[in-house]
């Protein structure tokens, strides 16, 4: 008999579900509760279904669901699509070009993702195109409410609470008679954001989600502590650029969508001039919307993801744990993307979609891939950050243009050190330089044994700028720098952070700096979990413009750092005792 079966709490491949030629593939449109393109009709989402043929004969199965704005094609990286970053902070940038997306993709197949993994194991796989993309109605809003309500409507349809039709307009009703109503969502990057968006609606039937490298707040994606800061690899990208990039929906709706969403709501709300956190960004931060959420959460992220940075998953994981939601996090040491091992995902969906009591909720809630291990072999921990980690406060010792020190002892005499901004030097060049006027570098003693960092490093800095605004960039590095092309991603940069000194009081409000006046600002660097090997030195590098991430103002701004009032706090497993052992 063709039914799902389980070994060791995992759904197994069912021989009769493996034959792709017997899979039933069809598409339809699910009617939502909103009209985001203002055409007077409720938006319908384009949905496709892939299911074993046995579901036509009474077999009901749970659903693995992925939704995306990317399925029907994107704008590509056209010249002039991104904002020009070569201008002073606080200045209006030059206008950028807008690009039209040529829609691709044919009915009935929206995507082939997930199907080979999950259909043979007894799941139905469902895909849908986000509002204003592909053959879905509506407007893309990049984090707006309709991007949460669209997958909610699809889940409602899978539970018999919303209507589906065989045509985009009118048509005959389609019923999900093959669905048990239990749904799990999965996806990477934007496709990982949308499961979280759906979960924040509290929709019944969404039992579990696996967001991989999800963008959980568009402010944290395009800004950093008040600073206009691009996601890694996409210098000059902003929320309106992403809107253009994904807008593959109905051509006749595009002019209206552009005017209302991109050229009004986004341009008025995103504030590329000041970079402050405001109502626009607040409404696109899923941390603020988690109260109704109940779906069991398995998150995955790379500690060296400089596109969607590791804080995106950490902040949601932390809140979900506080809320008592079943939660696990899988962190690896690589860059953007990278799912948990299939065994972890299978156990998660088996428990929450099939209801098999496999005790996954009693597993450790933190899994971290160690530096030399494969992504399939994470190490379990009680929680993240490591419960044995505590913050160790380090003061800056003079000599930063060459190599200053990081020490437990404070300076006895007041000491100021200066750097001159010049974006033409990238961070790696500055970190490797024996001396430079363009950065300040402070090193720990050479480590006599490994140091395990786990959690969030924090910097309090007292700094003055020669101009009314300046970039502030901070890298935590492991030196000597390994310049070998085969060097691992973990070997040089430990973590990074960026801030706008104008936001020293708050993220919501910035004010021009008085040149040469000192301001004190505290901010977090990106979360990390990394073992720094003996023989290395931990270095704090302070500089101004970060060539890969920030605006590129004219070189010459001088930052002066007051060493006595600047403090780096490192989350060290074993705390002060471990630091002393490694450095004395």
Where are these regions (language model features)?
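Catalytic histidine neighborhood in serine/cysteine hydrolases
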Residues: 321-337
């Amino acid at each position: 008999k063709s039914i799902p079966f389980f070994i060791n709490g995992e759904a197994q491949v069912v021989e009769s579900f493996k034959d792709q030629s017997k899979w039933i593939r069809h598409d339809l449109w699910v009617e939502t509760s909103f009209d985001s393109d203002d055409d007077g009709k409720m938006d319908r989402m384009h949905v496709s279904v892939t299911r074993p043929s046995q579901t036509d004969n009474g077999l009901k199965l749970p659903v693995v669901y992925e939704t995306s704005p990317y399925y029907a094609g994107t704008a590509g990286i056209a010249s002039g699509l991104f904002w020009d970053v070569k201008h002073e902070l606080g200045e209006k940038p030059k206008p950028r070009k807008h690009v039209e997306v040529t829609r691709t993709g044919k009915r009935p197949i929206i995507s082939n993702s997930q199907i080979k993994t999950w259909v043979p194991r007894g799941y139905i796989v469902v895909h849908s195109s986000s509002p204003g993309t592909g053959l879905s109605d509506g407007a893309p809003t990049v984090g707006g409410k309709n991007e949460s309500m669209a997958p909610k409507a699809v889940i409602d349809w899978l539970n018999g609470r919303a209507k589906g039709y065989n045509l985009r307009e009118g048509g005959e009703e389609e019923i999900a008679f093959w669905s048990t109503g239990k749904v799990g969502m999965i996806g990477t990057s934007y496709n990982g954001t949308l499961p979280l968006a759906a979960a924040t609606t509290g929709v019944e039937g969404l039992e579990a989600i696996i967001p991989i490298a999800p963008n959980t707040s568009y402010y944290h994606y395009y800004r950093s502590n008040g600073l206009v800061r691009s996601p890694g690899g996409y210098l000059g990208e902003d929320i309106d650029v992403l809107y253009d990039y994904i807008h593959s929906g109905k051509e006749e709706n595009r002019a209206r969508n552009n005017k209302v969403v991109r050229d009004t709501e986004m341009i008025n709300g995103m504030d590329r001039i000041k970079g402050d956190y405001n109502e626009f960004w607040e409404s696109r931060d899923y941390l603020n919307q988690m109260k109704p959420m109940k779906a069991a959460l398995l998150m995955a992220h790379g500690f060296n993801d400089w596109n969607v940075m590791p804080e995106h998953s950490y902040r949601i994981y932390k809140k979900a744990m506080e809320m008592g939601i079943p939660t696990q996090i899988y962190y690896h040491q690589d860059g953007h993307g990278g799912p948990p091992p299939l065994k972890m995902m299978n156990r998660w969906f088996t428990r929450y979609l099939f209801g098999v009591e496999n005790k996954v909720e009693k597993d450790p809630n933190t899994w971290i891939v160690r530096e030399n291990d494969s992504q399939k072999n994470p190490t379990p921990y009680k929680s993240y950050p490591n419960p044995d980690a505590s913050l160790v406060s380090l003061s800056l010792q003079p000599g930063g243009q060459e190599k200053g020190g990081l020490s437990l002892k404070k300076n006895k005499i007041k000491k100021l050190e200066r750097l001159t901004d010049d974006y033409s030097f990238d961070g790696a060049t500055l970190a490797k330089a024996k001396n430079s006027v363009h950065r300040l570098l402070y090193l720990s003693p050479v480590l006599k044994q490994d140091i395990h960092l786990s959690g969030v490093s924090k910097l309090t800095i007292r700094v003055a700028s020669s101009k009314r605004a300046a970039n502030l960039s901070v890298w935590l590095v492991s030196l000597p720098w390994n310049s070998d092309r085969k060097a691992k991603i973990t070997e040089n940069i430990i973590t990074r952070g960026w801030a706008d000194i104008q936001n020293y009081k708050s993220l919501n409000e910035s004010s021009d700096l008085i040149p040469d006046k000192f301001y004190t600002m505290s901010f977090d660097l990106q979360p990390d979990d990394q073992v720094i090997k003996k023989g290395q030195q931990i270095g704090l590098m302070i500089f101004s413009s970060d060539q890969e991430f920030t605006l590129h103002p004219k070189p010459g701004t001088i930052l002066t750092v007051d060493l006595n009032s600047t403090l780096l706090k490192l989350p060290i497993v074993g705390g002060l005792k471990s630091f002393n052992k490694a450095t004395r």
